[in-house]
């Protein structure tokens, strides 16, 4: 980020005055850098962001679709869903700061929740003079996690900008992220399955048992892992047509076991690739 862009960011801690437009309550217009990062760096919600300009024709076409999307998720949210924030960033005001790396407009991105709490540096601002505070802000800007967004948490939408495609995009990213977090929970010995939703606790316990009794003993055994994969895939194939509730529950556990096995294989592959380098 260039210096003039940063200085713009510092000044923008004051609320930017934006044109008065009609927006639904489900979509929030970003008015400051502070507001943008405060929302995007939450660990309890997803954040959908639309970057746009007033002169972009595609942005004008997208505007009512995006508002409808925000309203749709506000209506269908239930207590077990992780909330989704819907933001709009006007890149005519935030071009030097929030929009510097964008290839064009409009751009839509979904930011996944943080997996760990945000740890901020502790500074004694009250003991500093004005120019010292300003200089300290400049020095810490690039390293302050409050004003950073981990790119691994950002998924960019690529597709037709209609309600169905955008809704499918959100559901797919959220479903995959939920599964990844669930798998990480199972591998984390310090975490208890009681932390999960009640509906997921039995599945979590089955996953931890499988990891402890089977996968932990196969770690590093490529042939053993491949044999176990074939066994699980055969079970799914043999019972895939059985619609009974009991078999469905067993298949759910087997598919989880397959996901855990894939996670182990990916880890081994990453380790192998790193060793080759």
From Swiss-Prot:
Q: Does the keyword ATP-binding apply?
A: no
Q: Where is the signal peptide?
A: 1-22
- Positions of short motif Prevents secretion from ER: 274-277
InterPro entries for the chain: PDI (IPR051063), Thioredoxin-like_sf (IPR036249), Thioredoxin_domain (IPR013766)
Thioredoxin domain mapped to chain residues:
27-172
Q: Name the GO terms of the biological process aspect.
A: protein folding
The record's catalysed reaction(s) read: Catalyzes the rearrangement of -S-S- bonds in proteins
Stated consequence of mutating residue 56 to S: Loss of function
Which UniProt keywords are given for this protein, alphabetically ordered? Disulfide bond, Endoplasmic reticulum, Isomerase, Redox-active center, Signal
- Entry GO CC: endoplasmic reticulum
GO molecular function terms listed in the Swiss-Prot or TrEMBL record: protein disulfide isomerase activity; protein-disulfide reductase activity
Q: Where in the cell is it found?
A: Endoplasmic reticulum
Disulfide bond positions: 56-59
EC no.? 5.3.4.1
Another remark in the UniProt entry says: Present with 1520 molecules/cell in log phase SD medium.
The family classification in the record reads:
Belongs to the protein disulfide isomerase family.
Its job:
Non essential disulfide isomerase, which participates in the folding of proteins containing disulfide bonds. May be involved in glycosylation, prolyl hydroxylation and triglyceride transfer. Able to fold proteins by being directly oxidized by ERO1.
Q: Please give the name of this protein.
A: Protein disulfide isomerase MPD2
According to the entry, what is the taxonomic lineage of the organism? Eukaryota, Fungi, Dikarya, Ascomycota, Saccharomycotina
